[in-house]
Structure formats: structure tokens, C-alpha cells
Amino acid sequence: MIKVILTLLLAVARSAAAWSQSSKAINDLSKAIEILDATMERSFRGSNTNYYMVDVCDVASDAVSGPSDVWPYTAAIEAHCSVLEALSALKEEAPDLYDLHHEHYLHQLDILIDNLDYYRGSYTLVSYATRKTWNTVYAVPRANQRGRGDVTGDNLKKNVYDDQMWLARELIRAYRLTGNTTYRDIAIDLTNYVIDGWDCWRDSNGEEYGGITWGPGYNSKHACSNGPIIQPLVWLHDIVMAEDSDAMYTYFYRDDDNQVTSKAVKLAEHYLDFAKKIYAWQKKHLYNSQTHLYYDMLGADYALQYVGTGAARRRAHVDNGGPTGTAYPYNTGTMLAGAVELLRVTGDERYRDDIDDLARYCYTGFSRPVRLDGMTYRQWPTDATPLQGFNAWFDNVLMRAYVDASASPAPSPYCGQSLQSFETNLNYAYDHYLKSHMLPIDLLGGWGDNTKTKGFHQVSFASEYAMLAIWRHRQQADAVSEVRHEYRPSTHYYNLLGQPLQGTAGTLPHGILVASGHKLFVK
């Protein structure tokens, strides 16, 4: 006898729903793999030791442009992490997919992270409270040699804090997937680097001005240089608590008299405190209470200011203007994801209120109804042409935050509605506009006259499909019910392709099989 999960189609509604979710999860994951593989083929060049992503490719030819910046390259790492997480989550439902792809993507992930070294540079940064040499900082453009990234070019503007934040997030995910402590250690270094960009000068009330500038060469403080680090900070808190809860860190800051001082802090608590502090700062300064979405930035004068001389020279505070700029989906998405993590760790119900608020107003504020083929779709922001704008990835950041929020206790119904609309739009584009296994940025409108695309857009779509697979898998787990099925030699068993399977109760493959008109899930 073999234990299985047995679904009597059209007979047991709860189990039928579970199989529906499982089928959708596998379909989403399969499409993620298809798009990611096509993107790696068309948008990447070079050898394993000198591997790079091109900026633009063409679905109708082999034409490509030069190397991409570190931001799109990081999105390719993200896509691999998302697919690997989905493969692990669906290992029992889709063992063939797991066996075929898991080791391949682990190997490819290692290659991608190793070749980050072409963006890496080092320099001595004079910040608000410290003067320190950082050996692992990633430049915007790719260098021709490892470790020669131009992190000081254009008056420090060729490295920005948000790039380090996105990388820290994906390196933590890579560490969780592989156990490679090098990834964890780099993520910690990058996190400490961006925290060093926190404006710790105090105002006339003794309060920190707070906020992290866009980069060490900027005075403006952006949603994208604050919100993205909240989730990684909470993750690092979890990791340090689990691995070395007594780990200490020397933190430099400015005291009530604006003098530089330091204190020894527990590293795990330090990360959680900063996650809460950055979240509170961004909500106070960039939240639009009218739209319930987040502004882009606080502007400021371009000229950096310093105090002191020689070894005592430090960066000075520069006043910022009021909130301004377009409300982009990703800037609200990072706050939604941050609220989910902070609710999980702190239990503070104020974060739950924020989750519900953002889940609702992202749906009503960023998506709009579109009639197409007699049906109503919800269209999320897109760009006029594939070579202008980044809305495909911005939407991806918001969508993955909805996946996070959907797993929180008593999730908002807007989470499911939003995720359903993302999935529906991707499927529409896949069914109507797929070219060379790639999708147009206008999922509902198609390619038009364009055949060019960016790998950045395509890895975003792959990430979305992979995270949707995880969302569907969770829904299946909530719906599945278990019964026992007795193996009989006289029964014919088939895989989902209709191919007959040979074997005994002990040798039938794990995963979804079909027997006597019933779908079986073999554990």
C-alpha cells in the first residue's frame, strides 16, 4: 500500500481546489523557467569567469548592446533565487522539474554571484560619523577587470545605496538556498555600508534627521534608498539570532550634542532597530496620506558639505525639501514587504494596519481596469517603449510584496485580487504575444512594432511567475486534504503527459499521477 493524496475530481470541492492551485503553481513555475532560460541565452555573454549581461537584446535576431549596469544584473540573480525557491516549494508536486533544473540553477547562481566581482570596488568613505575603507562596494557600471569597479567616479555618484540594498536582499536569499556563508558575509558588509549612510546628525530638538541619501555622492533622500533595506535587515536579524545571538558590533553615531561617539550593540538587535527606524522615517517623510502611496524622494542641494579637517573630517547634514516625485509601485512595495517582516518579528499591530492600507491602495492606485476581448483586466504600470523606463521590474517588486503579505495572518483580500491580476496579465501575454520565449513589456497590448527588449524586463517576468508559483503552492497547502489509496497491480498509472508508468507501490515516482480517472499525489 502506498500513501497518496487523492483527489476525486468534481466530487470533493476542497481537494479539487487544491489540485487546481497545484496545477497553476506548476504552470507558473514552468513558464518562469522557460522565460529565464531564454533570457540567459539571449542576454548573457562570455565565459563562466567573465560572464556579463547585455543591456538590450532582440527577439528577432542575435543583436545585442553592451554590458548592463549592476541593477539589472542583480535582477537576474533575483530571478534565479525566485525560481530556486519555487522549485524547492514544489519539489513534491513537480519532482521532474526539480530534478531537471535545481542543480543547474544553483550552479548558474554561483556563476552570477562570482561575476559580480566585475562591479566591485573599494574606497575610503567619509560619512556622517565615520571614516572607513569599504572593500566591497558595487559600482553602477561594469569594469573590465575584477575588483576594479568605479565606485568613486563622478564625485561618488557611480555607487548608490539602493544598488547595495537590492544586492544584499538577493545575497541573503542565495545564502538561504545554498548555505554559502560568503554570500551571507557580503550581505552583512553591504548592509553595514548602507547603514553608514544614515544621517545621524541631530536637529534642534535632539532628534536625528535620519534617512539614507541616494548614495554617498547625493544629499537627496529617496524612497528607493531607504525602503529596500528594511526586509533584508529583518532577515539578517533572524540569521544572526539563529547563528550567533551574542554577536556584537561597534556603532558610530552622533550624540545629543552632535559629537561623534560609539557604543557596542548586539548585532541582531542593531539590525532590527534600524529596520524599525528606517521604516518609521520613510512613513513620516514620504507617505502621501491622500493617495496612501509613497512619494519618490526628498530633494536637496547637490553640493556635499563637510565639517572638520584631516582625519576628523566628516560629512555634514544638508537640509532636504519636501516630498516630491512620482509614486512608483516598487517604492510602496518595499514598505509593504517591510511591514510584513516587522509584523512577523515584533507583533506590533500597527504594521498590520499598514499592510491592509497599502494592499488596498496599491491595487486601487496603481492598477486600472482595461476591457479586452470582452473581459476586464487590471493593468499595472507599463512603459511607452521597451528601452525607456523600468516599470516591469517596479511591478515585480510590488507583486512579490503582495506574495509576502498574502502569507501574513488574516491577509487583506486585496492581496489575492492583486496577485490574480498579475497572473492573468502574464498569462494573457504568454498566450498571445510570446516571442522567442519572451514577453512584451505591455502585457495586454503586445509588442507593437518593437522586437527589442531588455533582459531586465524578462528576468522580472520570470521572477513574477516563480513567486506566483509559490503563492499558488501556499493556497494548495491550505486546501489539500489527505486520504489513503490502495495500490493495485491491475490499475494503470500515468504521468500528466499521459505516458504509462511501470512499477510497484514502492517504485512509482513521487509527484502527480493519474489512475482510473483520478489525480494522485504520491508522497
Question: For the regions a protein language model found, what residue spans apply to each?
Answer:
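Well-ordered alpha-helical scaffold segments within catalytic/enzyme domains
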Residues: 23, 74-99, 166-181, 228-264, ...
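CBM-like carbohydrate-recognition segments
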Residues: 22-79, 83-162, 221, 327, ...
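Boundary at the C-terminal end of the N-terminal hydrophobic targeting segment
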Residues: 16-20
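C-terminal tail/sorting-segment detector
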Residues: 512-523
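Sec-dependent N-terminal signal peptides
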Residues: 4-13
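Active-site cradle of extracellular carbohydrate-active enzymes
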Residues: 209, 216, 224-233, 262-339
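Residue-level detector of functionally pivotal "anchor" positions at catalytic/ligand-binding pockets or at interdomain
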Residues: 474-500
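Extended ligand-binding groove/face enriched in aromatic
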Residues: 100-255, 272-273, 277
